[in-house]
Amino acid sequence: MTDGGMLISPSALQDPGDGARPEDIAMDCTDGEEELCLEEILTLYSQPINEEQAWAVCYQCCRWLTQKHRRKETGVSPPGRIAGPGDVRIRKDGNVKLYQPSNPDKHTPPSSSIEIIESLGIMIYKALDYGLKEHEERELSPPLEQLIDLMTNMADTETDCPDEGYEATEEEDEGEEENAEVSNVRGYRDIISLCLSHLPSPSDAPNHYQAVCRALYAETKELRTFLEKIKSAKENLRKMEGETEEPVRDLNELQNADWARFWVQVMRDLRHGVKLKKVQERQYNPLAIEYQLTPYEMLMDDIRSKRYKLRKVMVNGDIPPRLKKSAHEIILEFIRSRPPLNPVSARKLKPHAPQPPTLHERILEEIRSERKLRPVSPDMIRRSRLGAGKSISTPQDLFRSSDIPDGPRKLAISTLSLANGTSPARSPVNGVAGGHSLSQRKRLLKAPTLAELDSSDSEEEQSTRKSDSSSSISTSLVEDTSPESVMGKKPPPQFLPISSTPQPDKRIAPQRRHSIEKEAPTNIRHFLPPSRQNSKSLAHALGSGHAEEFCFPVECLTLTVEEVMHIRQVLVKAELEKFQQYKDIYNALKKGKLCFSCRSKKFSLFTWSYTCQFCKRPVCSQCCKKMKLPSKPHASLPISSLGPSILPKKEPGASSAPTDKTSSTSSHKKNSLQRSLSRSSKHGDRSSSKDELELPEQFTEDWSTMEVCVDCKKFINDIISNSRRNLSTKRARLHRRTHSVYSSSTSSSNYKPTERTIKEV
């Protein structure tokens, strides 16, 4: 027996008489989630209730019966006898009600209040005696034992009558007077008055007993949740261990009854306090125990209110050293106690395993290992060019040497020889002289002359007009009379173009070679369009002539297409800020409802706008133009390299398309040859000013036609014209510096082939 009336002996751990296990108890006896039956509480704890809970259940049941007795007069069915703890329902708020069958037997007479009180007393006694064996009896406090005795013996007391012929003694009369008040129990109100007299302050009885029932409900719900978590944890542990069969119960394994016993002890210790020493006290304490708060709430309230006193833990009269130091100091002390590490200088690491070079490193290594070009001084170039003028032959010698069988193996002449304007000399016919002149011509073609630098303007136009312009020049000057070249059994003669860059003597780097076939003395076979296999080399060769335009430094900032586009967008934003004082125009331009160029055309649902791909502003159809601009990978090209090729060309009519194509091809070949042969003339550097420089079609095939506004188009054209004007100024200055070199040329430099000679070639 404990202070609170709870039994914690081993007998309390026995299962109920009906054999039901706590984990098998369901909520069948409850009407909802907000109430619990007393039988479930007893089964879950496997222990009886304490005396304070018995007082509370008795008081709350009598209150409910009193309310039902009042309603009996209004026609409500009277309550029946209480069969057991399963008929008592404890709600979440602390109120108690009794279970009544829905269909009572009409033939059974209704129970009287005395019978109901007697059944209530028996039910409370069973709850206090729950789990005990037959030969065991619980010792109760005198007031509670007297209350249960009165409730269970009301029927006997009422039927007893005093003997008329028997006179009691004085002592018996005094004892009867003392118990007169207690024995005078006739209904529910008398039981309630006895419960009120149990407390020191009867006015607090309703709240106190309701709090006791509420605490009983809360603790039971928490215990059930705790047991469910333990059960699920055990099941998960069995699944992890892979146990398929039901394991045998271990003697050391704690069951639900043990957990319930520990739970009750913890709750009692938290509510009553822990006593370190046994103190002789009275078994019955009339003072009420605090039930307004749960044990957890009481403990937290004490912590918040600091109703505690901490004592220093002393070891041999002093505080332990571990409590003096912080965790950081203890860790540092442990690290210092370890053996010291070797210094870095004394450590010897293993040699690092060589890693294979990455792809980027291999590419850089190949670039660095490329054979370096030998620099050629300008004096050597000038000396070799001036001394080689006597060995250059004329076009008449070319036709004369073409009849010799060894002609295909000889280089006749390039346009560079004609551009120099040297005196015509007859080339020897024999093989030795021909080989000597051949090697001399090869050496002359290695580097450009000053005359070539002077006439770079017209050469750029001739090299970038079309992809077959350079090949047309070479076919008009060089011919192969060997029939083997026509059949494809012998490689055709090859030569370097005019615009080839200077190369070292040991390197052979012809970027473009053309095979020349002769079918008739006065007829030249046209070139076939380049295939996909050699289009890359052809484009590179065509670009070499166009690259001469950028071989001189330009006295202005060289802007790329992407940079010019960014500059234009910044200028457009600045231009938009000028209209801030005009709110209507500013809002219309900012929202894209007004043309940004003319600022007169408004856009609506049926009138859509065009977006300029350069400045990203909406414009109308009249202010929108088409231009060919490079895509994102080619946006880093200089803006001056675009030229007129960015403008879409007008296609001729369908009827005149075939005739114009053939006539333009023949006239283009004629004009390109005339421009290449007129480099040495005084007016040759300005003769092609009307033909603007264009990029070849191979370069602009992947360019997309974009919609730009007229302002952006004018902006681009102004930048291109300014850059070309600065470039031409630089070339004119270079022409004046090198003009003295051409004055020493021989009289044969004024040679110009006639139109008849050009046609024959």
From Swiss-Prot:
Keyword Glycoprotein: no
GO biological process, one term: formin-nucleated actin cable assembly
Coiled-coil portions: 218-246
Function: Acts as an actin nucleation factor, remains associated with the slow-growing pointed end of the new filament. Involved in intracellular vesicle transport along actin fibers, providing a novel link between actin cytoskeleton dynamics and intracellular transport. Required for asymmetric spindle positioning and asymmetric cell division during meiosis. Required for normal formation of the cleavage furrow and for polar body extrusion during female germ cell meiosis.
Family from the record: Belongs to the spire family.
Record keywords, A-Z: Actin-binding, Cell membrane, Coiled coil, Cytoplasm, Cytoplasmic vesicle, Cytoskeleton, Membrane, Protein transport, Repeat, Transport
Spans annotated as Spir-box: 557-577
Top-level lineage group: Eukaryota
Principal location listed in the UniProt entry: cytoplasm
Record's compositionally biased regions (Basic and acidic residues): 504-520, 682-693
Pfam families reported in the protein's UniProt record: KIND
Compositional bias (Low complexity): 469-480, 636-647, 740-749
CDD domains with a match to the protein in the record: FYVE_SPIR1 (cd15767), WH2_Spire1_r2-like (cd22078), WH2_Spire1_r4 (cd22080), WH2_Spire_1-2_r1 (cd22065)
Protein name: Protein spire homolog 1
Membrane topology, as annotated: Peripheral membrane protein
Region annotated Disordered, chain positions: 1-23, 160-183, 375-406, 419-539, 630-694, 728-761
